[in-house]
């Protein structure tokens, strides 16, 4: 099974080291922002995972989501929206140009049954949750709670979730197996938790969005 870190944000001078470290951790692919694409995609050789360009936007209204999706379409491989209001969350879940909805401690309401039902009606979609807060502050109850809520709700509602490191430097990367173990610790079955870094799940989203 191919494994992907759905969000890596290396500084220009760190690109090679971050990507090679990701490869050593077992990732076959990583997703990077467009501004890192020129530098990172020029790297070749053994140990460099496949690269996806990820678009990311924070949106408060339907109009924000629509405009961002139209602007990013064709420039990136997939689009992630962090909704700042319930209106934006519902529209992002229905918009066929938006692949993934990002959820953290500030918008846990977006990972609800309503979002899941809209994605089910559309036929595809996923959530994304970052491990970065735990990386920077592993003792934070809020960071643990946010992760637990997203993982448990997504499992209960049947919505796929991607774990993202948001790593800027090599030491901020998580092994996919460590991420799965963390999810299992929070109550997700191990076999399901291993899918949180599945590149195949991303490909399914990309194929569905083109259909």
Curated annotation (Swiss-Prot):
Consists of a catalytic RNA component and at least 4-5 protein subunits. It is found in: Cytoplasm. One of its GO terms (molecular function) is ribonuclease P activity. GO terms for cellular component: cytoplasm; ribonuclease P complex. It catalyses: Endonucleolytic cleavage of RNA, removing 5'-extranucleotides from tRNA precursor. The keyword Nuclease applies. Signal peptide: none annotated. Belongs to the eukaryotic/archaeal RNase P protein component 3 family. Keywords: Cytoplasm, Endonuclease, Hydrolase, Nuclease, tRNA processing. This is Ribonuclease P protein component 3. InterPro entries: Pol/histidinol_Pase-like, RNase_P_comp-3_arc, RNase_P_p30. It comes from Aeropyrum pernix (strain ATCC 700893 / DSM 11879 / JCM 9820 / NBRC 100138 / K1). GO terms for biological process: tRNA 5'-leader removal. SUPFAM superfamilies: PHP domain-like. HAMAP family: RNase_P_3.
């Amino acid at each position: 099974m191919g494994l992907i870190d759905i969000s890596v944000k290396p500084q220009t001078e760190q690109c090679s080291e971050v990507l090679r470290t990701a490869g050593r951790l077992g990732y076959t692919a990583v997703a990077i922002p467009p501004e890192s694409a020129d530098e990172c995609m020029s790297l070749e050789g053994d140990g460099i995972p496949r690269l996806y360009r990820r678009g990311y936007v924070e949106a408060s209204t339907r109009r924000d989501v629509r405009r961002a999706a139209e602007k990013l379409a064709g420039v990136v491989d997939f689009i992630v929206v962090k909704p700042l209001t319930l209106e934006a969350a519902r529209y992002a879940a229905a918009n066929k140009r938006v692949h993934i909805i990002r959820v953290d401690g500030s918008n846990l309401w977006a990972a609800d049954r309503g979002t899941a039902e809209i994605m089910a009606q559309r036929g595809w979609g996923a959530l994304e949750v970052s491990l970065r807060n735990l990386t920077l502050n592993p003792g934070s109850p809020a960071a643990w709670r946010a992760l637990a809520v997203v993982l448990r709700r997504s499992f209960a509602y049947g919505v796929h979730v991607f774990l993202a490191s948001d790593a800027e430097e090599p030491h901020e990367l998580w092994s996919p197996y460590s991420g799965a173990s963390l999810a299992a610790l929070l109550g997700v079955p191990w076999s399901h938790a291993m899918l949180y870094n599945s590149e195949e799940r991303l490909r399914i989203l990309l194929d569905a969005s083109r259909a």
